[in-house]
Amino acid sequence: EISCSLVGSEMCIRDRFNADTFFNDCHPQLKADFIMANPPFNLSGWGQDKLLDDVRWQYGTPPAGNANFAWLQHMIWHLAPNGRIGMVLANGSLSSQSGGEGEIRKNIINADLVDCIVAMPSQLFYTTQIPVSLWFLAKNKKQKGKTLFIDARKLGTMVTRKLRELTDEDIKRIADTYNAFVDGTLKDEKGFCAVVTTQDIAKQDYILTPGRYVGIEEQE
């Protein structure tokens, strides 16, 4: 038995078998105010053929070879009317056009759900070198029709030859940037952050790679 506390909520995990969220949604009626998730990256063979007409695929059926947009839509399905998501996904989800992923991403963007995308630095994980980004989505965004892009790939400090960590200052910089965006006071910073309208994202074929929008850092 494993007991733990997360953000003030107690959980107890007893089952020794792995769960399957797609086929056995343990909380089918849940509408959450906040969701945090770090699902498996680029999972293939997740059972798409048995879930083709699932109600969770509001923005398009995810491809059989990659569950990234299945995870994303599962979380969106469980959001409350003012709910928010913070999620880690492999960078491929920002730009992939294969298996209908580009169309799903387009539909999610046009639904005005994407609040912020943060490109993270490499070597943050012990077990994989897959580059990742943070997706922040919201059902009732304060900044309508706009998305914040942050390129944080240069942040962090190497604590071993293979592992990088974000410092408290790095985390504060990202958080302060997001908070300024929500407040409507943020100014774009070349090479680091930019606020982009949905119309301008559409002009970029609905690709969400931050580097495409923040530009190159100005040299002194």
Language-model features, listed with the residues they occupy:
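Conserved SAM-binding strand-loop segment of SAM-dependent methyltransferases
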Residues: 14-19
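Single conserved hydrophobic/aromatic residue that forms the stacking wall/gate
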Residues: 1-8, 13
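A conserved structural/catalytic subdomain of Rossmann-like adenosyl-cofactor enzymes
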Residues: 23-220
